């Protein structure tokens, strides 16, 4: 994989910049932490070299100064809101986050329940946390929020919220997902800190959009693609331009709310420490791009993936909004992209046409070589492409059988005769298990298995929608999957994916 981002430089520069921001205030900074902390795969895809846990590693450099406060909305507890990527409810994700932070040595100070409502589910959640030794605090709904600034910054607003007792200079405010109330918690804490004579500060940590690269840079366009369902729009920060005469990038929600936030700062502290939304941020990622061309190409690929993902969701569930698709089409146009233009797509379609329109797949390896796979009597197309790619990487002739038909056929019998399956062909996970069994007695199979890490970061395209098993396996291998929004049996009404 070509590297476009200096991760070591980022860890050092980002942690130092946060230390400097802490010093600007009364040695107390509330840092609103947006995005994913442990597994930012979007950032790792568009900034090759950025590690999925880079933000966590950066925080670990500050762990002696930092404590974590996790925020969850009472509404999300009551509605049992689910985090899509993990398939667990927000309240359970709070427990998962506590474990994850503590396992790496970060101090979790407390959990704050926002928009507090005296519901049985909320009280049970608080009781459970308290029994585990985790302190909980309550913040309440404020009538007129966020526009009635005079009421919000008063004893009838933030003053009603419980003051979250914290011990360390850096308080990281994070949450299971968006809409939990992280910024409101930060500002409420500033109100209470100033009441106690502590001139604390606030800052916002968001990786995207990157403020010091062009508005229409592919990295920033890829962020818009990632948030197309929210209809976030990157914009030139007009406040920063007016204050400093410098063009920077922010996104619409932060720009729209800035006058309100600024007014709150003035009421809390007497004057605002910031002249623009960009000022509030601490993101240093833009300074660590070392090969712009690599990041541009990676980001263009990400935009295409997001577009395919939207089309597939529309086909499978019908839940993706038309507005989301239109937004992604606009971004495709802005980035000069078209469907079917990538070599991995072209070769997958060519293989399908060469086999009478049967499902086919292609994998683009890190050296640019594209390996294809067809649907056969033993393997599905993606399983075939996977085995062919491993052979190529291991220098094994393509005609070599790494797993014999005699080993595959009993698995097919198990699937169809005993487990009620209708498709005898092996999925990607099944062929990998068969390959691992063969590796015990075959040096060639073992050599192929050892190439699995080299599939990480490779693009794979299927000419039909894949089963959840195949999609999950590609994901676990770190491969970047796209599919045509077409079922293998298009005339059927029910499709098991």
Model region roles, listed by residue range:
Residues 378-394:
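A short, polar/charged loop-to-alpha-helix boundary motif
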Residues 185:
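Hydrophobic positions on the alpha1 helix immediately C-terminal to the Walker A/P-loop
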Residues 177-178:
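The conserved Walker
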Residues 374-375:
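Short clusters of small/polar residues that mark proteolytic maturation junctions
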């Amino acid at each position: 994989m070509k590297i476009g981002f200096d991760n070591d430089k980022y860890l050092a520069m980002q942690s130092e910049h946060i230390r400097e921001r802490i010093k600007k205030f009364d040695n107390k900074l509330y840092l609103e932490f947006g995005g994913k902390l442990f597994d930012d795969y979007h950032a790792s895809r568009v900034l090759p070299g950025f590690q999925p846990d880079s933000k966590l590693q950066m925080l670990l450099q500050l762990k002696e100064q930092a404590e974590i406060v996790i925020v969850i909305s009472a509404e999300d507890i009551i509605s049992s809101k689910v985090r899509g990527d993990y398939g667990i409810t927000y309240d359970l994700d709070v427990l998962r986050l506590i474990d994850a932070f503590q396992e790496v040595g970060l101090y979790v100070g407390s959990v704050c329940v926002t928009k507090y409502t005296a519901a049985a589910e909320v009280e049970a959640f608080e009781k459970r946390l308290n029994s585990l030794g985790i302190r909980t605090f309550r913040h309440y709904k404020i009538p007129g929020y966020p526009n009635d600034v005079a009421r919000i910054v008063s004893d009838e607003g933030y003053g009603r919220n419980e003051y979250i007792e914290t011990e360390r200079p850096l308080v990281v405010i994070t949450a299971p997902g968006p809409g939990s109330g992280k910024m409101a918690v930060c500002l409420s804490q500033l109100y209470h800190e100033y009441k106690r004579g502590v001139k604390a500060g606030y800052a916002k940590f968001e990786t995207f959009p990157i403020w010091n690269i062009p508005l229409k840079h592919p990295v920033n366009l890829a962020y818009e693609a990632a948030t197309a369902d929210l209809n976030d729009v990157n914009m030139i920060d007009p406040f920063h331009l007016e204050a400093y005469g410098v063009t920077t990038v922010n996104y619409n929600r932060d720009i729209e709310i800035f006058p309100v936030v600024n007014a709150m700062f003035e009421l809390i502290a007497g004057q605002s420490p910031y002249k623009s939304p960009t000022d509030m941020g601490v993101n240093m990622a833009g300074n660590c791009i070392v090969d712009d061309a690599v990041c541009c190409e990676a980001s263009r690929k990400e935009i295409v993936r997001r577009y395919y993902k939207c089309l597939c969701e529309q086909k499978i569930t019908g839940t993706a909004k038309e507005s989301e698709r239109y937004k992604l089409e606009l971004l495709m146009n802005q980035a000069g992209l078209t469907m079917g233009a990538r070599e991995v797509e072209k070769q997958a379609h060519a293989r399908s046409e060469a086999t009478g329109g049967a499902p086919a797949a292609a994998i683009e390896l890190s050296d640019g070589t594209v390996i294809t796979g067809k649907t056969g009597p033993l393997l599905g197309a993606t399983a075939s492409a996977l085995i062919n790619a491993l052979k190529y990487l291991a220098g094994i002739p393509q005609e070599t059988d790494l797993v014999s038909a005699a080993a595959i056929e009993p698995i097919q019998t198990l699937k169809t005769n005993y487990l009620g399956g209708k498709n005898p062909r092996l999925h990607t996970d099944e062929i990998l298990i068969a390959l691992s069994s063969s590796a015990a007695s075959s040096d060639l199979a073992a050599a192929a298995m050892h190439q699995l890490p080299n599939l990480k970061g490779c693009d794979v395209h299927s000419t039909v929608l894949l089963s959840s098993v195949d999609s999950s396996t590609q994901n676990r291998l770190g491969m970047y999957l796209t599919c045509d929004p077409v079922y293998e049996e298009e005339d059927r009404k029910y499709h098991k994916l």
